[in-house]
Design a protein with these regions (language model features):
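N-terminal entrance/gating region of PLP-dependent enzymes' catalytic architecture
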Residues: 1-61, 276, 367-375, 386, ...
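Glycine- and acidic
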Residues: 28-36, 59-65, 100-103, 127-135, ...
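Conserved PLP-enzyme active-site core in the AAT-like
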Residues: 40, 73-249
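Short loop-beta-helix segment that forms the pyridoxal 5′-phosphate
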Residues: 52-80, 131-134
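Short, glycine-/Ser/Thr-/acidic-enriched flexible segments
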Residues: 111-113, 137-138, 168-170, 199, ...
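Active-site C-terminal subdomain of aminotransferase-like
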Residues: 169, 213-330
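Short beta-strand
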Residues: 333-338, 377-382
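Conserved PLP-binding catalytic core of the aspartate aminotransferase-like
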Residues: 334-369
Length: 420
């Protein structure tokens, strides 16, 4: 098999860290960071958060906290949603629990990542209370169905807690209708959380930025620097409009030796390490944690905002190159039009119409690709059809290996089809 950092590896939405990020990770470990009082790590975390908030197009008034990844980043955002819904009913969910909230409901598309389901269980919202919205013809959350769910639940006395939008699902990279979902959330005063763990970086490609809408209308946003930014795995980020609400949702009572409560760092102190007392340890799940902002800071210092924009555009172009080949080759079938950096296609010889037979053929192609070891996509299911899925997120991906993947699929597919 291929290493995750190989230019032909396109299986996952995570990748090996860049050299600079790995060096930053090592420096973070050696520095033995603490999240309390005047720590250089808190300063670097704060700087990196402010840079990412600006880079991703959020207002300066928004706050952020690093997490261990997308799972925890979504839990933090959903925890804020839970606190918001409870406080509208005069309840402190963090203090008194969920028992007094009548039948909480959360709405998300059927392509929502399972980490949202996990958050429902961890936060006591209940996995059974996640309303999965069917997809429209563009494989996005169906807005009419979303509205119908909300009206049905409100009429029955249930409590809408959050609407969750997908900023690029991990199967096909399709972005939900986020501007319209934000408007629906505002109409009903429901928290709008966006899972952009993989695809949130897509806002940096001006060709698709409009699909993400006005980020000032988001209430919380999860994004993973350990994906497109190529930071070390274990680096997530939650961005939120209300730091005080995060504090009420996640604050703890300090031990006697930490009686001076940590405070959230004001925006104006972001360039001064002496303004940092405790950083953001009351804004999330972790208490002790590494300085995750140091590798992020190092990568951004190395490639800059324009370098990151160029990376996202390049990877999106790679997915479009695969799609163009799939449309041009008689033996290939494009199964999902790329919006971001994921291309889903399959080998389909002329005259082959049986889905079970096509699935077996393409599964065989994938196995042979793994054996040959030059290109390694993954597989997924698109509308009931087995697909070869190439996800371009690795900074080492290049044009040569984009072409090589399609060439290998054609060569192997022809051989296996002839043997069938």
């Amino acid at each position: 098999g291929l290493r995750t950092g190989h230019p032909g590896f396109t299986s996952w939405v995570t990748t090996a860290p860049s050299t600079t990020a790995a060096a930053g990770h090592l420096a973070s470990a050696v520095a033995f960071p603490q999240r309390y009082w005047f720590q250089p790590g808190n300063h670097l975390d704060a700087m990196a958060v402010r840079w990412l908030i600006e880079l991703l197009g959020f207002p300066a008034s928004f706050v952020g906290t690093f997490t261990s990844g997308g799972s925890t980043a979504n839990i933090v955002g959903m925890g804020a949603a839970r606190q918001h819904a409870a406080e509208q009913l005069g309840i402190d969910a963090a203090l008194d629990g969920m028992g007094a909230i009548p039948e909480p409901r959360v709405y998300a598309s059927s392509e929502t990542h399972h980490v949202v389901t996990r958050a429902m269980g961890v936060l006591g919202l209940g996995r059974a209370n996640l309303r999965l919205v069917e997809l429209d013809d563009g494989r996005r959350a169906d807005l009419r169905r979303l509205q119908a769910f909300i009206h049905e639940d409100q009429s029955a006395g249930r409590t809408p807690v959050a609407i969750v939008g997908n900023a690029g699902d991990v199967n096909t990279g399709i972005v939900d209708p986020l501007p319209e979902m934000a408007a629906i959330a505002r109409e009903h005063d429901i928290w709008f959380h966006v899972d952009g763990a993989y695809g949130g970086w897509g806002v940096l490609d001006e060709r698709v930025e409009a699909a993400f809408g006005d980020r000032s209308l988001y209430d919380s946003f999860a994004v993973d620097p350990h994906k497109w930014l190529a930071a070390p795995v274990g680096t997530g980020l939650t961005i939120c409009r209300d730091g005080d609400l995060l504090g009420r949702a996640f604050s703890i009572e300090s031990g006697a030796y930490l009686r001076e409560r940590s405070r959230a760092m004001p925006v104006e102190d972001a360039e001064s390490p002496w303004g940092v007392i405790g950083g953001t340890m009351d804004w999330g799940v972790d208490f002790s944690m590494p300085t995750r902002g140091l590798p992020v800071w190092a990568v951004l210092k190395e490639i800059g905002a324009e370098g990151m924009r160029e990376r996202v555009r390049r990877h999106n172009d790679f997915a479009r190159m695969v799609a163009a080949r799939a449309r041009a080759e008689e033996e290939l079938e494009l199964l999902s039009e790329p919006q971001l950096s994921i291309a889903c296609f399959r080998y389909r010889p002329p005259g082959w119409d049986d889905e079970a037979r096509l699935e077996g053929l393409n599964a065989g192609i994938l196995s042979e690709l793994r054996r040959v070891g030059r290109s390694l996509p993954s597989s997924t299911n698109v509308g009931g059809r087995f697909a070869l899925r190439a996800c371009y997120i690795n900074p080492r991906n290049d044009h040569e290996h984009v072409k090589l993947l399609v060439d290998d699929v054609l060569e192997i597919g022809r051989r296996l089809a002839a043997e069938a």
